[in-house]
Amino acid sequence: MLTRKLFRTAWSYKAQFISMIIMITLGIGIFLGFNMEWYTIEYDTSRFFADTNYADFRLYDQNGFTADDLDKIAGINGVNAATRFLSVNLDIKGKTNKSLALDVSENFSVSTFVVMSGEKYDENGEGFWVSDKFASANNYQLGDELTLSFQGMDISGKIVGLIKSGEHMICVADKNQLMPDYNTFGYAYMSPKKLRTVIREKLKMSGFPENLITENAIDEAENKVYAQVNILSDMDKESLEDAVKNALGRTIMVTPKTDHVVYKEAMGESEEGKTMGSVLPVLFLAIAILTMVTTMHRIATKEKIQIGTLKALGFKNRRILRHYTSYGLFIGIVGTALGAGLGYLVCKAVMSENGMMGTYFDMPDWTAATPFFAIP
């Protein structure tokens, strides 16, 4: 009997009940959605960074790093892996306003990529491993010839793999570009061996006597080209700076991953999600609570006679109290259920390959994740 009365009363106050359910739905939906968003960002990016050995620190020296320098850095206690690294923006020959960030990671255990299709990485390969998004946007296929322009010379090779890289998860040409545009800019990797071939050809073009273009001469030129070392390490910046200075006998620039545009922007998006997930739900839930208090007071005042009748019929105070409490429980259950669905939709609208973040992040996996405190 009391159950039927609950639904009759709910129908009588349907406007108030619907508004409370909507407010709770919005509050729970936004709370769950944005908390899922920031947690998904951290969960998916951390896995992607681990899969591609995203560098913890980047070391810069305009004079370049020798192979001996690399050995000394790699030998520092606390450095797990290190590589000499090159990244330079080059134009695509024959194409207007189209360029690539050409990367070379000498030790392919740091700053690597995952192959989406095509050949796996080969340190002696002669081809290019190209961003799959850039290839798709510009109609490049596996096996197509790609030619890059570098200081008056051509660097040519076939596209042997389509990839995604943590170093270019947010693929922008420089700090002035706010959003990725794969129609005009992407990235590619080539092998250290192909880089040495390019250096040899560059020395020839520069008028260097061919009989003097020895392996030692190429090594010297290569040392100047590698002006960056990427490392994996759990050390703090100050400790690493001191250790590198002691190892190399000179001071160089050390930047942590928190200063790198990819990591910095990803964590910035995560912090925005945390803020949205903690502020906005309070507003909607506060409105729902105020509406509920007002409505329940109105119901209790209007149904004094009915409450007296129920007591006369033998209903105990505890059961009557439980009945009127069930109004709030009913509203909360319905609103929470709808809010959980809305929260998932909010998360997927933001964190999916075809969602808002899909135009900003380039990752192979978009698994939605929920923090333990937001599990409904």
Please provide the spans of the model-predicted regions:
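Small-residue-rich transmembrane alpha-helices
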Residues: 249, 289, 293-298, 303-305, ...
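Internal alpha-helical transmembrane segments of multi-pass membrane proteins, especially GPCRs
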Residues: 268-281, 305, 309, 321-330
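Helix-capping/transition residues at the boundaries of transmembrane alpha-helices
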Residues: 23, 301, 310-312, 335
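Membrane transport/envelope proteins' first extracytoplasmic loop
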Residues: 2-289, 298, 317, 352, ...
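Alpha-helical transmembrane segments of integral membrane proteins
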Residues: 15-22, 276, 327, 331, ...
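Short, flexible micro-motifs
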Residues: 30-32, 121, 164, 291, ...
